[in-house]
């Protein structure tokens, strides 16, 4: 166990003793302050269990304290987060908050109008969310469209190239479900061992645990999906038989086998937490068919109104009826105004509509009226679930504010921190398991922290650093500050590595990564010379002025010296040494240019070089001698030759 872990445990122990010695209670804010940022849900559960065993009540912060947010503190936080200096406000403006256009003030004002939830309220809302989910699953399982999707997903899951497990289910929810079912089998020894795990690799362990969970539960999910696919096959066969035996589709409400299979399907699907994309895939298909059906019925209603049929009369005869040839014959005998004329003059249109409605019934496996009732039930359950989630979220927005304020001045504006925290809060609502016996804020705190810290890691830095590396950087920085207070001097990487039980190379690497980038436009000095940091950085690719002058002078001198030779000799030397050209040439290449042998070119080159070695010519080039390679286009190559 590291010193950091011991420090965290000591904080919890001291908080527990303090609560026992006083009034036997502690607030959630006290626990949140004692827990480090990287605390996992399981560790929070263990801490809450310790307080529960010690019979210490865990209370919300004072409602007045939760609602009351000091104007000065909020103004300061807003200045910090937006980097905007506000002018002092008049007293009348401070008193009249209702007319302010400050988005933070308006947000806090609306947020303060929602009452805090008790434990009983949270359980009641969680049950509403759970009931809405159950209703949705039961409705989906009655649809042959969903049955076809279940079968397809099973086939894709077996073929790993088509679908991964994480694309089908919500791994986190399934992992939490497995933890809940196996929670009773855990003992205190295993809990103690888990508390002693090193937190240096929290994020990496989470990634590994997710992959490990995916591998572990894959056989179970495949087996369950196989069973679901088999049940769906049985239900679809019975539905098909119903079509064959009767002239049209019908609901098998009186079939015991059908109802038993349906109940079994609902039970199996309830055990699998499909991710939102898969559920949306089924719902979007059903809603598309429902919209198409509504458009057809609306067009039929408008046509009926043209023949003098009132809206109420149309609904009385249409709603609840099976629209087929028998209905058409029945309505021809209807003595109410307009019906006989409509069915006679628009006979082709009516026949086409009956055929289209029949196609929808075959596609959905349900009568049109039953399909519409099913869609209405699904939409109602969705509305109830969304309203319950909304109630839970709005009542816990104060928690987001209290956590977001701790992360000010880390690269994101205050409103952005609130927004990211709210996203984490919404995830917490989806994952909340009220049966574990703890308050919602326990789980929400972890999810909000995670959302905010990840947003800071992803968005605050100019150069993005992975989240797990950000966590390691923060851990090293905290340890470095702690050791500075203990030792009185900046700790070395070796001392930090020893304290964290981490390889020294990794500490050096992390400390190097932690350096912030600096803008080249940063002003340098306090004067008015407008100097910037970029002006003092050497350009390795730029030519120094002295070198440029030497090269220019060398070219001029070389040109004058070569001009003292014959044109042929000058041309041969330029081609052989690449002077004024992109590259040098071989004897064979020069010979081809002059249409002579390579031996003749060698003789001309030797004669020209002997002329250049004459003191009258050579003394002009001696001052330019360099160690450059032959053929790099440098005229001083002539002297080396």
From Swiss-Prot:
Annotated stretches, region: Sigma-70 factor domain-4: 561-614
Composition-biased stretches (Acidic residues): 180-197
One GO MF term: sigma factor activity
Span list, region Sigma-70 factor domain-3: 471-548
Major localization class: cytoplasm
Region spans: Sigma-70 factor domain-2: 392-462
InterPro entries registered for this protein in UniProt: RNA_pol_sigma-70_dom, RNA_pol_sigma70, RNA_pol_sigma70_r1_2, RNA_pol_sigma70_r2, RNA_pol_sigma70_r3, RNA_pol_sigma70_r4, RNA_pol_sigma_70_non-ess, RNA_pol_sigma_70_r1_1
GO biological processes: DNA-templated transcription initiation
Short name of any one Pfam family annotated for the protein: Sigma70_r2
Compartmental location: Cytoplasm
Portion annotated as DNA-binding: 587-606
Motif position, Interaction with polymerase core subunit RpoC: 416-419
PANTHER family (UniProt xref): RNA POLYMERASE SIGMA FACTOR RPO, RNA POLYMERASE SIGMA FACTOR RPOD
Homology family: Belongs to the sigma-70 factor family. RpoD/SigA subfamily.
Protein name per UniProt: RNA polymerase sigma factor RpoD
Organism: Rickettsia bellii (strain RML369-C)
Taxonomic lineage from the root: Bacteria, Pseudomonadati, Pseudomonadota, Alphaproteobacteria, Rickettsiales
């Amino acid at each position: 166990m590291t010193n950091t872990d011991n420090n965290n445990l000591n904080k919890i122990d001291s908080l527990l003793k303090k609560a026992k010695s006083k009034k036997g209670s502690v607030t959630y804010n006290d626990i949140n302050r004692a827990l480090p940022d990287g605390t996992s849900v399981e560790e929070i559960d263990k801490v809450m269990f310790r307080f529960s065993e010690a019979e210490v009540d865990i209370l919300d912060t004072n409602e007045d304290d939760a609602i009351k947010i000091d104007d000065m503190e909020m103004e300061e936080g807003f200045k910090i987060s937006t980097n905007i200096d506000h002018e002092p406000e008049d007293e009348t403006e401070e008193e009249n908050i209702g007319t302010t256009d400050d988005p933070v003030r308006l947000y806090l004002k609306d947020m303060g109008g929602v009452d805090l939830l008790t434990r009983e309220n949270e359980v009641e809302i969680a049950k509403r969310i759970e009931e809405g989910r159950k209703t949705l699953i039961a409705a989906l399982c009655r649809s042959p469209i969903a049955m076809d999707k279940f079968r397809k997903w099973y086939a894709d899951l077996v073929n790993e190239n088509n679908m991964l497990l994480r694309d089908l289910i919500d791994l986190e929810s399934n992992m939490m479900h497995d933890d809940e079912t196996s929670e009773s089998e855990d003992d205190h020894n295993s809990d103690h061992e888990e508390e002693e795990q090193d937190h240096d690799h929290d994020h990496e362990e989470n990634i590994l645990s997710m992959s490990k969970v995916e591998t572990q539960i894959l056989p179970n999910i495949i087996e369950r999906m196989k069973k679901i696919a088999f049940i769906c096959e049985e239900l679809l066969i019975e539905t098909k038989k119903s079509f064959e035996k009767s002239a049209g589709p019908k609901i098998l409400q009186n079939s015991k086998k059908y109802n038993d299979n349906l109940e079994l399907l609902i039970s199996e699907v309830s055990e699998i937490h499909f991710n939102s994309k898969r559920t949306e895939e089924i719902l979007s298909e059903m809603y598309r068919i429902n919209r198409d059906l509504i458009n057809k019925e609306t067009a039929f209603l408008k046509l009926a109104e043209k023949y003098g049929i009132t809206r109420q009369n149309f609904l009385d005869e249409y709603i609840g009826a099976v629209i087929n040839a028998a209905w058409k014959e029945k309505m021809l005998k209807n003595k109410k105004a307009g019906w006989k004329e409509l069915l006679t003059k628009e006979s082709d249109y009516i026949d086409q509509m009956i055929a289209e409605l029949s196609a929808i019934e075959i596609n959905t496996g349900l009568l049109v009226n039953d399909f519409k009732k099913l869609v209405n039930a699904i939409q109602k359950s969705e509305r109830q679930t969304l309203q319950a989630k909304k109630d839970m979220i709005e009542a816990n927005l104060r928690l987001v504010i209290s956590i977001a304020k701790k992360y000010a001045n880390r690269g994101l504006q205050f409103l952005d921190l609130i927004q990211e925290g709210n996203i984490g809060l919404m995830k917490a609502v989806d994952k909340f398991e009220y049966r574990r016996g703890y308050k919602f804020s326990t789980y929400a705190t972890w999810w909000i922290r995670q959302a905010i810290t990840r947003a800071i890691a992803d968005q605050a830095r100019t150069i993005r650093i992975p989240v797990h590396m950000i966590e390691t950087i923060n851990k090293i920085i905290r340890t470095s500050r702690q050791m500075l207070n203990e030792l009185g001097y900046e700790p070395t990487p070796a001392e930090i590595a020893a304290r964290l039980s981490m390889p020294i190379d990794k500490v050096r690497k992390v400390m190097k990564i932690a350096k912030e980038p600096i803008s080249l436009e940063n002003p340098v000095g306090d004067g008015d010379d407008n100097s910037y940091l970029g002006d003092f950085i050497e350009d390795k690719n730029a030519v120094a002025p002295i070198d440029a002058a030497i090269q220019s002078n060398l070219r001029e001198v070389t040109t004058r010296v070569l001009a003292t030779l014959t044109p042929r000799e000058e041309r041969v030397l330029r081609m052989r040494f690449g002077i004024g050209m992109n590259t040098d040439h071989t004897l064979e290449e020069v010979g081809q240019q002059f249409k002579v042998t390579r031996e003749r070119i060698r003789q001309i080159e030797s004669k020209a070089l002997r002329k250049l070695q004459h003191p009258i010519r050579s003394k002009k080039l001696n001052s330019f001698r360099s160690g450059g390679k032959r053929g790099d286009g440098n005229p001083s190559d002539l002297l080396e030759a």
